[in-house]
Amino acid sequence: MALATIASAQQTKSYDSYKGLVMAGYQGWFSTPDDGGKRGWYHFQGKDGTFRPGSTNVDLWPDVSEYEKTYESPFKLQNGKPAYVFSSRDASTVDLHFKWMKQYGIDGVFVQRFVVDQKWPLGKAHHDTVLDNAMNSARKYGKAVCVMYDLSGMSAGDEKVVLDDIKKLAGKYNLFQHQRCPQYLYHNGKPLVAVWGVGFNDGRKYGYKETEAIIKGLKAMGYSVLVGVPAYWREMVKDCDKDPRLHQQIKMCDILLPWFVGRYNEQSFPGFRKHILEDMKWAKANNVDYAPVCFPGFSWRNMNAHKKQDVVGMPRNKGAFYKMQLDFNVHTHR
């Protein structure tokens, strides 16, 4: 499908609610030594800090045929020619991703702000650039953007980092003036901010004191809040803390997003459907909107190559696994 080039004002669409939208996560974390960001092969590199045959963090190689700007890597294609990758820092990379969203019917993205990177000058500069480019391309193609704070790696006391950052973003992008920033996602009449990583039992360095401060702080500023929680948040088992404060904090928020990645595969998903339906009942009874996660499958063999045990991902099966989840969740949310 050919896409005509139209003036930005004609492309702009106002996003007033998350309801009915299909949103993707957008990490924007890939770097190259020559992209100007001084982060080396960030997220491409293996555990030893190098990106080369035998040391990498990725299992899938990107098809870069449509990218305007690419970078030669230490890898070779089967024909002996150099293999190229993209950088998330480049405006042309982000623009292509939003063009694809328009082409394939994806409504927008949650652009992640990793709290741990906000304290690292090069990391902050990189993700500031990614967000700038995303806001520009979202407006160009009529797509939605929502900021998501990923708390992974955060320490106690870093809640101030989150609240200070969103204050700066609100001024920079006019988040509370929807006519001036129509591409920013609103929900329940307010700009939406996502906070991912509340209630997990994997030994994090922050707790409910910090997450409550973030949620209450965002609410006091006038935001709606989406909270990302473990898959088993309702029963508080398996991947979830057994602490009543989790449910209390979920009830403070506008939207609940459980993390289902890796919690089932194509064979076990049919049995997981009841879990989602029970989640939805709880959310409705407590006046919280519910957003289930669908994922296409993945492999992380190289990411976990340092571990002795064989690491198995979730087979994609040519899209059948993804379609199974989408069909169920779209049908149940009509």
Model-derived features with residue positions:
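Bacterial Sec-dependent N-terminal signal peptides
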Residues: 1-10
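Glycan-processing catalytic domains of CAZymes
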Residues: 10-334
